[in-house]
């Protein structure tokens, strides 16, 4: 499964570079892993250059066994699709330690005949699978149905993923992908230690935020050459943790963003660099929800055929003109004090000399510990 982690990390930073162009000073939140798994679902039925483009952009071409035929991909257990399924099953199963809801599905115009093997395969591997709806004569009802499904899958959190007029009678296919995350820390922050303090959005501007605080032993690294610090906070599940990448300076985010990459993050978070130390941690409460048009994002990254008349999705349906004109990704994350073990009050461990104070813009990610797959990646400019 490790190679999937590498692919998702590489893809994560490719997406980040592209989103940054259009969201220069905004909060950002997306799930590289969820987008990757959705593209894997499409990849199963893509042919020719449509397939080659997905292969390249999502780095599947570097993974063993990914290019096999649909029969081979569904029939074997030791391949990438089943590894993706195993991670998805692990992170989305009912758990007291966190709630991680994923809604990912393809919707096709009901008059198109879908290849039975494809239907069977995506159902088996990707739960959401493919659903037929009537865009042709009831586009708005179809939109309502899709929105209701995403809302129910994310426990009411992500609503109206498809905006009015995003589908019409000409729509052949829509791809929706949404993720909602609420985590429980391994070590809780005590609510009474949370205080309202200024968060410095820029050198000139600040805003009051609810700043959580605790003192504890955490993996941390100070990178003098990169002018930043990294902190790892484990979630109670034991399967995930959150990395916070904090520039030393209020205006240091730009430098961090221009240097960060799959290779760099792997190096920075290696056991030779990060070590467990006693730290005073200050982290703002966060509630973030972002929505992105995947069509324009993926086209800019090199997946162009899928969204145009050049698309070859003959592994999904024999209809010659089938393409995906509309693809949307939504992500939600809530970070607060809640945790499994309540440690003593922050004042009890005043012997910690090191401080990690996230009171200015930073990057963060939620990762799957076993595989290093990046489940969520975010930029917090203004909590």
From Swiss-Prot:
PTM sites of type Phosphoserine: 69, 345
GO molecular function: serine-type endopeptidase inhibitor activity
This protein's UniProt keywords: Acetylation, Disulfide bond, Glycoprotein, Phosphoprotein, Secreted, Signal
Record's protein name: Ovalbumin
Glycosylation positions in this chain: 293, 312
SMART domains in alphabetical order: SERPIN
Gene name tied to this protein: SERPINB14
Processing after translation: The signal sequence is not cleaved. The functional signal for membrane translocation of ovalbumin becomes accessible when the nascent chain is 50 to 60 residues long. The hydrophobic sequence which lies between residues 27 and 43 folds back on the preceding residues to form an amphipathic hairpin structure which is the signal element recognized by the membrane.
Source organism of this protein record: Coturnix coturnix
């Amino acid at each position: 499964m490790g190679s999937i982690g590498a692919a998702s990390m590489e893809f994560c930073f490719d997406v980040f570079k592209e989103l940054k162009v259009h969201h220069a000073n905004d909060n950002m939140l997306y799930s590289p892993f969820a987008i990757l798994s959705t593209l894997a679902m499409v990849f199963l039925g893509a042919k020719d250059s449509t397939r080659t483009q997905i292969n390249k952009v999502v780095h599947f071409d570097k993974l063993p066994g990914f290019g096999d035929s649909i029969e081979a991909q569904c029939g074997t257990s030791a391949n990438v699709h089943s590894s993706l399924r195993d991670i998805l099953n692990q992170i989305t199963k009912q758990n007291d330690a966190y709630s991680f809801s994923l809604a990912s599905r393809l919707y096709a115009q009901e008059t198109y005949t879908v290849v039975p093997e494809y239907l069977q395969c995506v159902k088996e591997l990707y739960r959401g699978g493919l659903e037929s709806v009537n865009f042709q004569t009831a586009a708005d009802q179809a939109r309502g149905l899709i929105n209701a499904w995403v809302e129910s899958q994310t426990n009411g959190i992500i609503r109206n993923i498809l905006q009015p007029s995003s589908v019409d009678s000409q729509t052949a296919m829509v791809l929706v992908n949404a993720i909602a995350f609420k985590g429980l820390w391994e070590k809780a922050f005590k609510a009474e230690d949370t205080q309202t303090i200024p968060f410095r959005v820029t050198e000139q501007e600040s805003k009051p935020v609810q700043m959580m605080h605790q003192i504890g032993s955490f993996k941390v690294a100070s990178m003098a050459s990169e002018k930043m610090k990294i902190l790892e906070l484990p979630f109670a599940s034991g399967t995930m943790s959150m990395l916070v990448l904090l520039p030393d300076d209020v205006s240091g985010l730009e430098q961090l963003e221009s240097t960060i990459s799959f290779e760099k993050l792997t190096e920075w978070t290696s056991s030779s660099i990060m070590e467990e130390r006693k730290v005073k941690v200050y982290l703002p409460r966060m509630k973030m929800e972002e929505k992105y048009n995947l069509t324009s994002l993926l086209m800019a990254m090199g997946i162009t055929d899928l969204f145009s008349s050049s698309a070859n999705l003959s592994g999904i349906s024999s209809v010659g003109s089938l393409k995906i004109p509309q693809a949307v990704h939504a992500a939600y994350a809530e970070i607060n004090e809640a945790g499994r073990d309540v440690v003593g009050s922050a004042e009890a461990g005043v012997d910690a000399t090191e401080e990690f104070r996230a009171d200015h813009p930073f990057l963060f990610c939620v990762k799957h510990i076993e595989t290093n797959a990046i489940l969520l990646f975010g930029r917090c400019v203004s909590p």
